[in-house]
Each structure stands twice: as C-alpha cells, then as structure tokens.
UniProtKB/Swiss-Prot annotation:
This is Transport inhibitor response 1-like protein Os04g0395600. Pathway: Protein modification; protein ubiquitination. GO terms for molecular function: auxin binding; inositol hexakisphosphate binding. Transmembrane segments: none annotated. The record marks 134, 160, 375, 484 as: Interaction with auxin-responsive proteins. It comes from the Eukaryota. Its main location: nucleus. Gene3D superfamilies: 1.20.1280.50, Ribonuclease Inhibitor (3.80.10.10). It comes from Oryza sativa subsp. japonica.
Amino acid sequence: MTYFPEEVVEHIFSFLPAQRDRNTVSLVCKVWYEIERLSRRGVFVGNCYAVRAGRVAARFPNVRALTVKGKPHFADFNLVPPDWGGYAGPWIEAAARGCHGLEELRMKRMVVSDESLELLARSFPRFRALVLISCEGFSTDGLAAVASHCKLLRELDLQENEVEDRGPRWLSCFPDSCTSLVSLNFACIKGEVNAGSLERLVSRSPNLRSLRLNRSVSVDTLAKILLRTPNLEDLGTGNLTDDFQTESYFKLTSALEKCKMLRSLSGFWDASPVCLSFIYPLCAQLTGLNLSYAPTLDASDLTKMISRCVKLQRLWVLDCISDKGLQVVASSCKDLQELRVFPSDFYVAGYSAVTEEGLVAVSLGCPKLNSLLYFCHQMTNAALVTVAKNCPNFTRFRLCILEPGKPDVVTSQPLDEGFGAIVRECKGLQRLSISGLLTDKVFMYIGKYAKQLEMLSIAFAGDSDKGMMHVMNGCKNLRKLEIRDSPFGDAALLGNFARYETMRSLWMSSCNVTLKGCQVLASKMPMLNVEVINERDGSNEMEENHGDLPKVEKLYVYRTTAGARDDAPNFVKIL
C-alpha cells in the first residue's frame, strides 16, 4: 500500500466538508483517524446526550465551528417537559478547556445560562458567531457579556428564544472598536432597546448585511438605521404601527430606496395596512418574505404586497391569506421554492382560512416548490395527488390538519391515497409530517416508497403496530421518528432492533408502549438511552403496577456513547 504524506492526506480531507464523509474516512486506519480529528474544523452534534462534551472537545481540539442540538423536536409543540434537560453549560465548559480556537457556536432547543454566555465570551479570543435558536434560560445580561468581550463578533443571531429582559443596556456594551458585525438578529427580545446605541452600532458596521429588529424599534429609528446601512440584504422591520406620523414614513421610504441590495424582509410587527405602500417599491427585488408576525394584515393587504414580489423564492405567511391569496401567490411567484402557512389565532368554527384549494393552486403555479409547511383545517386525497404530480421535487412536505383524525372533506375516506401519492412521486423526500384520518395503509406506502426519508412526524394516525413496523422496516435512511397519540405499542417498538443502530432518535407520546416493552428494548440494545418520562408526579407508579402492563406516558430513545446522563430530573427514568 502506498502511503501519502500527512500533509497530502489532510489536503485531500479538506475537500470533504460533509461530516458523514469525514466520519467515514476516519475509520480507514489510525493514521487517517489522527489526521482527520486534528484537521476537523466543523462539528455537528444532533443530540447533546449522544456523546459527552468532553469527548468531542478531546477528539477535535482544533474545531472552529460547533453546532449542538438539545431537546427533541416535539418540544416546539410543548410535548417535552420544561425541566427535561438540554443544558448548554457542559458543552461550553468543555470547549473552553479544550477548543481554544472556537470561533462559531450554534445551539438549538437548549438551556443556556448567563454564566455560560459569560464563560463563552471570555474563553475564545477569536470568537465570531453565536446563533441561538429556540433556547431559554438566559437574559440580556448574558448578551451584554458577549457584546463586551467578543471583539471580533460577526454574527449574533437570536431566533425564537425566551430571553429575560433586564433592560436595554446590553446593546450599548458593544465596544467602539467593534466594526465587524455582518449579521444581527434580536427580534425575539421583548424589551426596549436603546435607539442611540443601535444607531451607533450599525453606523460603525460597514459590512452589515442582515439586521432583524424587535417590535420596540420605531419607524423613525428604522429610517435612521437604513440610511447608515445601504448594503443591507436582509431586514427585519421594527414596529410599523397605525399610529404613525407621515413624515417618519416618508423618511423610511427615502431610506428604503437607497437599499438596492435588499432581498429579504421580515418583521412587520403590528403593521398597519397603510404602511405597506411604503414597502411596495422594494417588492420587485425580494426573494424572501416573512409575514408570519403580521396578524393585523388581512388577505387583501397581503395579496397587494405579494403580487408585486415576482422574484420570491421563500414565503412565510399566516393562514389569513386565504385560498384567494394563495392563488395570487401562484400567479405571481413563479420561482417560489419554500412556502410556510402558519395558523392564526383567529378561527371561526366551520370556516377554513386556507384549504386544499389554495395548496393545489400553489402547486400548479409554482413548479419549483420543494419545501412546504401547511397548517389547515381540511384536505382531500384528490388535492394531494394533484400536488404530488405538480411538484415532484419536494424534499420537505409537512401538512398539519389542525383537527385530529379528520378525513377527506369530500369523500370522508382516510387520506392514505393522498399521502401515498406524495411519497410515491417525490423521490427525494427527506422530511415528512402527516396528519388527518390515516390507517396502516399510508405507512405501507411510506415504507415502500420513501427511501430517502430521514425524518417522519406522525400524529393521531394508524390502526395497529403494523403501521409503525412498515416504516421501521422500509425506510432505510430514517434518522428521526416522532409519534404522538397513535396506537403503536410494544410489538412495533421491538419489531426491528437493527433499525435503532442507524437512527438518531425515537419519540413516542400517548401511544400504547408499556414499561415492560421499554425494559426489553433497553436490555437488548445497550447502546441506547431509553428514557421513560412520567410528568404526573415523578413517582415510580409505572414500576409498581407490573400486572396491568401500564402504558408509558412519553418515551425518548436515542443512540449514545455516553451512557445514562447525570442531569435527568426525577420524572425521567433512564432504563
């Protein structure tokens, strides 16, 4: 065998950015393992309990970018108890001890303390990017520490976090020498910000390309900021209220006209329909538009704006857009690739804001559509069959019918054939969420056709264990399976042990799994953590009642090299 110099091998490895590929080459021999671990610059950890933080830091001491995910995805729907875990502290502490060159940290669904942010800010002299998504546990004091000490910060991105507001001081903690910001997003912070500090910060950030403001930022402040950021590409507006002064909006219009590079808009907090006309001149150049925080706008307001966005590729909107509004999307946005329609708070029984008609219209008019999240109150098989034929390039298809177990609204039949068409026609489908009245037949279709599927979400579906077994046996690339309120039990859980060797995780809540079944799984698969979650009182009542084979309230199963975690609360039992 011919051996290349280590420098040559490392150079070859640099052409393998995908973590999966690098993991593979590290298994070839000890020499390659050493070269790969010392040259790895980016590490992704999909489950913070799958491996110990110290082990990651020891293996990859030269890592520059670290991504860690915490709580299961169903935490977004309040199905994971608040104190379940997902703590960022051990990861930041391990990195501070062993990865001194860390420059970027991204965390999702994790509990991040102010103390951890303080440690982060003081430990990495070349730290450049902090991205926190759906995290909690920290306050603006932690952000103040990051602003004060991370003097090379390029990106501070706070998305959908629960942040305790302790005043507007944090924004003034960026030193005068901080001129490196490229992206700043604090839209999720609920408190006031210091307008003067914000204006000064953006004024000395010539490379700023993305800025997303919270609802406390006034129109007048927004106009002043935009005059200082003519190269902005992504803007999250502040508060566009009905109580406005015309002079401020004219200033805003003048400032927006100078933003020739702007391609994405979001925000529109408490937006007044009157203010939208000031945005119209920008619409023709937009490729991204997020109107999901604008409940004050009705279908007419939305369509007047969207009809002008002829280059739009990504649209997030509330269901108040209506089917007619989606027809406007279909006729105007021919390049649309991603559509998300979220439920609004206002709903009248018997009235559906968006239905199968709007979805079919978009599929007909937007042939490039490949990613969908669609909340609605009704659907038909015929519509789903049409959508599948019109848009066979879906990689993500998430349909959420808000009334559990609702059948085809026309035929009253299960929606098996509709979802069957989706998995049959969309060969590259990687993520799927299904809902409505569904039998085991739909899972037979999924197991047979969804060969590229990596994540499947199931709610209120299926007849028997056979449904889940179709998926476990057929979907060879499945990484994450999450199920709620479905009749799958021990036979499905224990039907294919080998599948757990390649899956990242399984979540089951309000199903028919018993404690005995969980114990069998844990004994057969020692590389798994089998977590039984009993929120009711944290007692061991399930263990004490073996005779009736009590059902498990919630089950979380995941592969791990770390063994049982040591921070589990008393309502979590790790078998």
